[in-house]
Amino acid sequence: MSTGFFGDIAKVKYEGPDSTNPLAFRHYNKDEVVLGKRMEDHLRFAVAYWHTFTWPGGDPFGGQTFLRPWFNETMEAAKLKADVAFEFFTLLGSPYYCFHDADVRPEGKNFAENTKNLNEIVDYFAQKQADTGVKLLWGTANLFSNRRFMSGAATNPDPDVFAFSAATVKTCMDATHKLGGENYVLWGGREGYETLLNTDLKRELDQMGRFLNLVVEYKHKIGFKGAILIEPKPQEPTKHQYDYDVATVYGFLKKNGLENEVKLNIEQGHAILAGHSFEHELALANALGIFGSIDMNRNDYQSGWDTDQFPNNVPEMSLAYYQVLAGGGFKSGGTNFDSKLRRQSLDPADLLIGHIGGMDCCARGLKAAAKMIEDKALSQPLADRYAGWDSAEGQKLLRGEYSLDQIAQWVEAKDINPQPKSGKQELLENIVNRYV
């Protein structure tokens, strides 16, 4: 049943690359087979509940620009928002969605009321999922917006805030589990500091380790089969965030013995803020065995802010999905659009247009990446470059069969005097451009 919010807009369909219809897909054909799998099953698109339905359109210099009929803290408004959201998922053809607890329920006066409100809306969502076939990619807790979290959640100097945060995560994990969510995400927006003058770094890192262990223990207790995912970000809103990037989070997981329990949800915009390319973070996560899922967006490269715009750069998407496919593709993860409209994009249709463009961009990137993999366009040059390490002597070096002094004797005896070889960067860049 239509809410009327989207007027007479029909379900978005694939019309092919020659279409000029802004409310049609030009490249995303969910049933097209790519590398033996349907495109929908490769990409596993999800809509972010927060940016799509709760963001008011503000910025640091101005307030709300979006006037949504569900913008008030009542259960009636929360259910109207859910009606519009699931209508949107159906119109767009998105197989998944994601949410924070604070996105979907009205704020209560205490923890008990928050839990009651969340449980009520979860029951409502369960019926919506049954009616539409839309599934939950992941759930999470908002532990950063309310003023109680201004000094952190897990890393707060007040143990009562730690306890409140842990209890909130417990209820959100229960909600995610009940709705059949395939992952549970932790983003530490306030887990960091503004100044070291009032921060005990070791204590806060120990607190964060204990918190994450509690989450993993509870996952196993309730039989949740999805992945626990951490989402790295270097700063914003804190000056320095503890889950800075993939490498930092891996070190934290190793320190706490959780590298086999927790994987990462990697966002394109956060990678850029950390001074990395998106594909670097994806490749490193795959190399370390902790890749889980992605948040898809882009930043304005001039502003230096995390602007959360819809992706529109096909070459970037091609290299990103190349790393995803090279690592074996998504398991329980997917492509969540952590993207929001610009504050001047006021029309309901703009919500669809933004997602359509992003989905088309990702689809083009996926197809280019798949073709590069099929043709071994990058993998063969890479294998040739490292071929020496596959030789008998190279493998002995890696296995530790030679000591340092034995290696020195070997180099002298064989008169080894290696000469450098071209890295062929320009050729490889030109090869990529053939596909995009």
From Swiss-Prot:
Reactions performed catalytically: alpha-D-xylose = alpha-D-xylulofuranose
GO cellular component terms, semicolon-separated: cytoplasm
Keywords, ordered alphabetically: Carbohydrate metabolism, Cytoplasm, Isomerase, Magnesium, Metal-binding, Xylose metabolism
Gene3D superfamilies according to UniProt: Divalent-metal-dependent TIM barrel enzymes
Similarity comment: Belongs to the xylose isomerase family.
Keyword Magnesium: yes
Cofactor note: Binds 2 magnesium ions per subunit.
Disulfide bridge positions per record: none
Subcellular localization: Cytoplasm
MF terms in GO: magnesium ion binding; xylose isomerase activity
Positions contributing to Mg(2+) binding: D306, D308
Keyword Cytoplasm: yes
Entry EC no(s): 5.3.1.5
The protein, known as: Xylose isomerase
NCBIfam families from the UniProt entry: PRK05474.1, xylose_isom_A
PANTHER family xrefs: PTHR48408, XYLOSE ISOMERASE
GO annotation terms (biological process): D-xylose metabolic process
Subunit structure: Homotetramer.
Cofactors (names): Mg(2+)
Catalytic class of the enzyme: isomerase
Domain of life per record: Bacteria
